Amino acid sequence: MIYQKQRNTAETQLNISISDDQSPSHINTGVGFLNHMLTLFTFHSGLSLNIEAQGDIDVDDHHVTEDIGIVIGQLLLEMIKDKKHFVRYGTMYIPMDETLARVVVDISGRPYLSFNASLSKEKVGTFDTELVEEFFRAVVINARLTTHIDLIRGGNTHHEIEAIFKAFSRALGIALTATDDQRVPSSKGVIE
């Protein structure tokens, strides 16, 4: 199933769709480094993303990065509500040369982000690295996930961010994996 949403504000105009059919993705955020990270997200999560974004990137990349995270989170929440029968938990360690990242995801209905990643530099190219946390906070809060992101070792900032994105994507993909168990994956009987 394809989930689609538009978001139009004074700062951004977004048209985003997500599906779990692994169809080809098209990503145009206007921010080269973010395009690269979201391409990794699609490959490693098994999800398909189509993004057409325009924003005030002449100011900086903050609004478009955060707003894309908001919409991806909202679309993931719709997908989760429709799925009902999924593994729920996902954990992944990703090494990238000198770097090691760990991400743990719980599709809990309780939004929480622990972001423990001191990135080595403030920029990768023109991309402000502080936006990595802003992006994940937007996704996690809007998808109502509990997520722990830990950069265990680092060195090269590009590698650090790439390892985090890959680990999150793989952990999310595991958590979203369909299961034959017809019970809601919570002893409470509900995930809200």
Curated annotation (Swiss-Prot):
Keywords per UniProt: Amino-acid biosynthesis, Cytoplasm, Histidine biosynthesis, Lyase, Manganese, Metal-binding
Subcellular location: Cytoplasm
Source organism per UniProt: Staphylococcus aureus (strain N315)
Cofactor(s) listed in the protein's UniProt record: Mn(2+)
Binding site for Mn(2+) 1: 36, 63, 158, 162
Manner of cofactor binding, per the entry note: Binds 2 manganese ions per subunit.
GO biological process, one term: L-histidine biosynthetic process
Binding site for substrate: 11, 36-44, 62-66, 88, 110, 158-166, 186-188
Cellular component terms (Gene Ontology): cytoplasm
Keyword Manganese tagged: yes
Protein name (database record): Imidazoleglycerol-phosphate dehydratase
SUPFAM superfamilies membership: Ribosomal protein S5 domain 2-like
Pathway info: Amino-acid biosynthesis; L-histidine biosynthesis; L-histidine from 5-phospho-alpha-D-ribose 1-diphosphate: step 6/9
Stated family: Belongs to the imidazoleglycerol-phosphate dehydratase family.
EC number in record: 4.2.1.19
Signal peptide: none
Superkingdom field: Bacteria
PROSITE patterns referenced in this protein's UniProt entry, alphabetically: IGP_DEHYDRATASE_1, IGP_DEHYDRATASE_2
Binding site for Mn(2+) 2: 62, 66, 134, 159
Catalytic reactions on record: D-erythro-1-(imidazol-4-yl)glycerol 3-phosphate = 3-(imidazol-4-yl)-2-oxopropyl phosphate + H2O
Cross-referenced CDD domains: IGPD
GO MF annotations, alphabetized: imidazoleglycerol-phosphate dehydratase activity; metal ion binding
